[in-house]
């Protein structure tokens, strides 16, 4: 989806996840979309609560991401269709896994609902993914792939 200003300029291109009938997540790349959403809700007189979720997102992007995700979490998350998501229990750690990402490649976003387990998840994925070529990257990595 695109969030635009009154002149059609792009503010952000977030992913919207509908976790329940009355519970949505707006996963943003950057910017002040939280403030924008609060402003829209207040101006429209909506009876909603808008807050930043306590999650830690991790991107798993690239041509081997499905293989790595399958090795880490099994077939069901690895076979998610584009722009779909699922909630997943990883050894008692709640995750939301979506088939989305910023790389224009095959990819997934893993939202860790317990940020204190971030190091554990990172180490686990790096251990499983290293033999398949997984390494830390960032947006500038794309120009070198």
What is each model feature region?
Residues 1-23, 27-43:
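Extended, compositionally biased flexible segments
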Residues 1-12, 65-95:
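Internal amphipathic helical hairpin motif
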Residues 10-20, 50-51, 94-107:
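Residues forming anionic-ligand binding surfaces in small-molecule and nucleic-acid pockets
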Residues 29-34, 63-65, 113-118:
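Helix N-cap motif at beta-to-alpha junctions
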Residues 41-49, 76-77, 125-136:
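A common structural junction motif
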Residues 106-122, 126:
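A conserved active-site cap/scaffold subdomain adjacent to cofactor or substrate pockets
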Residues 143-145:
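Conserved small/polar residues in nucleotide/adenosyl-binding loops
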């Amino acid at each position: 989806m695109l969030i635009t200003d009154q002149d059609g300029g792009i503010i952000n291109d977030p992913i919207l996840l509908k976790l329940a009938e009355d519970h949505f997540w707006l996963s943003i790349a950057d910017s002040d979309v939280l403030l924008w959403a609060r402003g829209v809700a207040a101006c429209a007189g909506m009876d909603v609560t808008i807050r930043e979720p306590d999650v830690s997102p991790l991107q798993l992007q690239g041509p081997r991401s499905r293989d790595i995700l399958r090795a880490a979490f099994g077939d069901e998350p690895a076979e998610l269709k584009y722009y779909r998501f699922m909630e997943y229990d990883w050894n008692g750690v709640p995750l939301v896994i979506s088939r989305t990402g910023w790389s224009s490649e095959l990819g997934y976003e893993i939202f860790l609902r317990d940020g204190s387990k971030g190091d554990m998840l990172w180490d686990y994925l790096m251990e499983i993914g290293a033999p398949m070529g997984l390494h830390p990257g960032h947006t500038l990595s794309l120009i070198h792939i």
